[in-house]
């Protein structure tokens, strides 16, 4: 067995270590002063009364201090107590051993055994080993300690055997077992002290107590023996230090509750103590919605006076002839009691007058409420300058206006607040437009900024006026046309899908343009192209045309668009459906591309604000947004602002829809006769899918003695114009038409629309019934449907359900109404290819 390696410590290191130990008590007092109680902080007799807790904490780190074992004075005192306990225990063991030796000698003499002889042999061997170790140079002290340990083990083993043969052995053995766990580390530490010969105490006290002559301070070098139990000793010191640190922190935490909140926060932040962030949140606190406005802008107060001003009642205990009240009682405690009686009395006397409400008076109604019933904080009772962002948001919600595509200017509330030119306001007054429609409210201010617009609005929403007014304002800012500039073409161009719609837009535009002195020319089929070319050659500011005739004029060089930078596409979805996409594309390509804005949104925004240069403005209006229209808008519109009024393709709620399931054409005639006789009074529009069906309906109307006219593509342009004009002037009570009259034809006062032949798609159905219920009036739409009309059944059922109209039982249970036509696949059928 190799002897353990020796570690030598020089005298200089020992001296340096002693100096550190002398400074240690001062540091201990300093750090303990940091955690003194509040009375010490407030004591005016201290040496440093001006020092605050923050200044002391800045100089000393408590965690670093405790990790380095700075509190050795307390540990030393605890060691002294352990050493005193060890001395007392050693004396008790010696007395016990002496008494036990005498007992063993007595037992041996009495013939009890040879225990005493073994003790004498063991003591003799121990003395011999000790003499040999000292003679060899003191290096055998480790073996001496090992022998002592083995000797103690043998002694306890002998005691166990001896106790097993004597009285009370089980009691003493149980006590040793109970005390064994408590004696483990303490006995080992005491043996460490004995092995080190008081080394631990001398290092801290600078005194050599309990050592041999070789450990005196006169020697230049001294020996530091290595022990296998040093790890246990270090672990215990570390554990004691950690426990002491926790006690100090517990004292700090207890004192934190009594301290000033500011000082507590300073301590917590400096010492890195984590706050209790896992606070139990109140139910509903996490997802609680917080409004962006304060309570002063709240417009959600009840409109009913019974809730805004509570009725305070003093009970009369059954007295009174009107619900417990006396009508002549003037008791001030009962508010409104006289008014309740008087109001009910007046209501009973004037029942007929109160029931006749004028629903067409839209000027006094907002969101289904009378303006007088609205609170004072409502936007309708605020001046324009007092409107907040929230007010504009509510304004758009009231009129079902939504925009996207960047920041859009605020809509106009009234014509008086619009700041439009005097000529426009005069034309509006003459035409009798009391207030703008939702599409006009939002479209006009956006168009005046020069932005492109993609407008989606229901039929009969006033889209014509929405693009005519900004178009005229744009032209008014351009130089007047001369004989030299007239050859370069018009300033503005409007395209519509049908002749009737073109003529209607022309009439509407002339009503406004005459106040500016602008000239308007229409180009439609069915008329002489030479006569139209002659009108264009004389010069005009605005051209309104169908795509086909306009493209013919461009190809024959009757017209050029060199200075046309304002273009409107009305009813774009219908133009695409009628197959005018090539003509529309050809016309747009004929316009100068140098005036087209950049495709980059940032650059296009800068170009819109540049008033020194003219850029093209494109406005596209449509009732629906099919893929082809969306493709067209992406190609020719730059940074457009999308305006949606209501929902795309949605039927207005003012139209009541009825669907009649019929079995044959004869059933249609019978139901048509009944609708003409028992239905709303004229004017009435009857739609058919084929021109020959007009001849089928004519005899039925003659039997009902109703005047009628026919409008379809097979008639000449003069006949079509005469038919439409006669129907508008009430010369004819019924108009029989094909799909040409379903888009954009506005006839005032149409009360009833009858679909003798229901269309194949829901879009055409929407536009047909949109001829009634215009300008805020109510309307009725009746449709005949057969088993062959499977293409529209699913969509028709959906639109009837969404508008709270009655769905006939035949349509509700029909297989084609359960899923969209063309989307089902019969998986039960198998196809075998040969």
Curated annotation (Swiss-Prot):
Positions occupied by motif Q motif: 413-441
CDD domains xref list: DEADc_DDX23 (cd17945), SF2_C_DEAD (cd18787)
Enzyme class (EC, first level): hydrolase
Pfam families: DDX23, DEAD, Helicase_C
EC number: 3.6.4.13
Annotated segments matching region Disordered: 1-245, 322-371, 813-834
Role description: Probable ATP-dependent RNA helicase which may be involved in mRNA splicing.
Domain notes: The Q motif is unique to and characteristic of the DEAD box family of RNA helicases and controls ATP binding and hydrolysis.
The name this protein goes by in its record: ATP-dependent RNA helicase ddx23
Organism this protein belongs to: Dictyostelium discoideum (Social amoeba)
Lineage: Eukaryota, Amoebozoa, Evosea, Eumycetozoa, Dictyostelia
Gene: helB2
């Amino acid at each position: 067995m190799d002897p353990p390696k020796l570690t030598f410590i020089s005298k200089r290191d020992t001296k340096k270590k002693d100096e550190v130990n002398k400074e240690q008590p001062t540091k201990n007092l300093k750090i303990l002063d940091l955690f003194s109680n509040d009375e010490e902080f407030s004591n005016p007799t201290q040496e440093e009364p001006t020092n605050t807790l923050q200044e002391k904490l800045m100089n000393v780190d408590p965690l670093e201090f405790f990790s380095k074992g700075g509190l050795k004075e307390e540990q030393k005192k605890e060691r002294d107590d352990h050493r005193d306990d060890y001395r007392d225990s050693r004396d008790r063991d010696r007395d016990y051993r002496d008494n036990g030796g005498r007992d063993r000698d007595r037992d041996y003499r009495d013939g009890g055994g040879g225990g005493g002889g073994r003790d004498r042999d063991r003591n003799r061997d121990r003395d011999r080993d000790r003499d040999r170790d000292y003679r060899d140079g003191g290096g055998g002290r480790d073996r001496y300690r090992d022998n002592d340990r083995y000797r103690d083990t043998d002694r306890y083993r002998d005691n166990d055997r001896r106790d097993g043969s004597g009285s009370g052995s089980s009691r003493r053995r149980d006590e040793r077992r109970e005390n064994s766990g408590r004696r483990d580390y303490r006995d080992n530490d005491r043996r460490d002290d004995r092995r080190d010969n008081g080394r631990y105490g001398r290092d801290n006290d600078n005194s050599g107590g309990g050592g041999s002559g070789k450990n005196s301070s006169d020697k230049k070098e001294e020996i530091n023996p290595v022990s296998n139990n040093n790890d246990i000793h270090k672990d215990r010191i570390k554990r004691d230090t950690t426990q002491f640190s926790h006690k100090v922190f517990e004292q700090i935490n207890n004192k934190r509750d009594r301290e000033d909140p500011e000082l507590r926060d300073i301590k917590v932040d400096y010492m890195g103590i984590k706050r209790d962030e896992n606070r139990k949140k109140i139910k509903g606190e996490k997802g609680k919605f917080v409004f962006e406005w304060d309570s002063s802008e709240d417009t959600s107060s009840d409109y009913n006076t019974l809730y805004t001003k509570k009725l305070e009642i003093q009970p009369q205990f059954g007295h009174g002839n009107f619900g417990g009240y006396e009508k002549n009682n003037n008791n001030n405690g009962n508010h409104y009691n006289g008014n309740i009686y008087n109001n009910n009395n007046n209501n009973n006397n004037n029942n007929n007058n109160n029931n006749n409400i004028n629903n067409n008076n839209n000027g006094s109604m907002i969101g289904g409420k009378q303006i007088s019933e609205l609170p004072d904080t409502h936007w309708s009772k605020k001046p324009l300058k007092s409107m907040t962002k929230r007010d504009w948001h509510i304004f758009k919600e009231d009129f079902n206006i939504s925009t996207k595509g960047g920041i859009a200017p605020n809509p106009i509330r009234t014509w008086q607040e619009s700041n439009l030119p005097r000529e426009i306001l005069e034309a509006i007054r003459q035409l009798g437009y009391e207030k703008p429609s939702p599409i006009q409210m939002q479209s006009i201010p956006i168009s005046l900024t020069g932005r492109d617009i993609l407008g989606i609005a229901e039929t009969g929403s006033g889209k014509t006026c929405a693009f005519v007014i900004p178009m005229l304002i744009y032209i008014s800012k351009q130089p007047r046309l001369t004989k030299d500039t007239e050859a370069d073409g018009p300033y503005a161009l409007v395209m519509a899908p049908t002749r009737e719609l073109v003529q209607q837009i022309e009439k509407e535009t002339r009503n406004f343009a005459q106040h500016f002195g602008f000239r308007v020319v229409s180009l439609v089929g069915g008329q002489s192209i030479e006569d139209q070319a002659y009108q264009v050659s004389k010069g005009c500011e605005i051209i309104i045309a169908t795509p086909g005739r306009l493209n013919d004029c461009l190809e024959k060089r009757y017209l050029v668009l060199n200075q046309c930078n304002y273009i409107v596409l009305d009813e774009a979805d219908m133009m695409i459906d009628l197959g005018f996409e090539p003509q529309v594309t050809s016309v747009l390509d004929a316009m100068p591309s140098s005036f087209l804005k950049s495709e980059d949104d940032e650059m296009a925004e800068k170009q819109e604000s540049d008033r020194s240069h003219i850029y093209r403005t494109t406005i596209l209006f449509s009732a629906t947004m099919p893929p082809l229209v969306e493709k067209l808008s992406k190609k020719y519109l730059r940074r457009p602002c999308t305006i949606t009024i209501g929902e795309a393709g949605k039927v207005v709620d003012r139209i009541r829809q009825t669907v009649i399931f019929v079995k044959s054409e004869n059933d249609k005639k019978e139901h048509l006769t009944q609708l003409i006789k028992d239905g709303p009074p004229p004017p009435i529009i009857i739609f058919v899918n084929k021109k020959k069906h007009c001849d089928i309906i004519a005899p039925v109307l003659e039997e009902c003695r109703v005047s009628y006219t026919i409008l379809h593509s097979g008639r000449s342009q003069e006949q079509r114009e005469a038919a439409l004009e006669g129907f508008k002037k009430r010369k004819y009570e019924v108009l029989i038409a094909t799909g040409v009259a379903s888009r954009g034809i506005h006839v005032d006062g149409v009360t009833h629309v009858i679909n003798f032949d229901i269309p194949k798609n829901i879009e055409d159905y929407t536009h047909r019934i949109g001829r009634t219920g215009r300008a805020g009036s109510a309307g009725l739409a009746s449709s005949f449907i057969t088993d062959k009309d499977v293409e529209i059944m699913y969509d028709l059922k959906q639109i009837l359900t969404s508008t709270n109209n009655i769905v006939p039982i035949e349509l509700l249970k029909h297989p084609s109404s359960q899923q969209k036509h063309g989307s089902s696949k019969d998986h039960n059928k198998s196809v075998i290819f040969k």
